[in-house]
Amino acid sequence: LTPLNLYGYSKQWFDLWAKETGALKTIVGLKYFNVFGPNEYHKGDMQSMVRKGFLQARDVDALNLFKSYKPGYEDGGQERDFLYVRDAVAMTLFFLEHKEIGGIFNVGSGKARNWNDLASAVFQSLNKKVNIKYIDMPESIRNQYQYHTCAEMGKIRSAGFVEAITSLEDGVSDYVKNYLIPDKHLE
């Protein structure tokens, strides 16, 4: 694992410290992948692409995605492990209910999906024709941009988490139809 920035290094250093000191027997560390869902309106630029894409698709009937600069990945074909917030909560609560378990666990879907899939799900949830515009990726992030992330879910499954994970399409549909369109916030 090679972190891409100081924030990533700080997380890795803590993980290594916890492992070296034996603390992992008594604590749980969770590595969240690309979580999206209700109540992220306060996150500004850090909101998920589901919310950002919803606003673009609703307001201008188009959704912007970065062009690809890596062979083997089409424009919008960069992959992420997208996870609906309900599943992230279920996995987190699993460890609260099983205090005997310790270690570092991934919280993801275990499936890499691309940005085109996410954009299509947003348009489908709005009953609109898919209209993706591919834009240049800023030079400042091109060399650091991750083209593939996917959570390895074997460890959390072996620990006993057996619940099904919501599909990208079902999660986007629920979020768009039940929260974003009616502008509903969880309290």
Question: Which residues make up each language-model segment?
Answer:
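Non-catalytic, hydrophobic alpha-helical segments
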Residues: 88, 92, 107, 118, ...
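Mid/C-terminal beta-alpha module of Rossmann-like enzyme folds, strongest
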Residues: 53, 57-59, 91-141
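Catalytic helix-loop patch of NAD(P)-dependent Rossmann-fold dehydrogenases
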Residues: 1-36, 40-41, 45
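Glycine/proline-rich active-site loop of Rossmann-fold NAD(P)-dependent oxidoreductases
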Residues: 12, 35-51, 74-77, 85-86, ...
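Amphipathic terminal alpha-helices
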Residues: 167-187
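Residue-level signal for the nucleotide or nucleotide-sugar donor/cofactor binding architecture
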Residues: 5, 44-48, 80-86, 113, ...
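Glycine-rich Rossmann NAD(P)(H)-binding loop
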Residues: 35-39, 65-80, 105-113, 137-145, ...
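Conserved C-terminal active-site "lid" loop/helix of NAD(P)H-dependent oxidoreductases
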Residues: 85, 139-163, 174
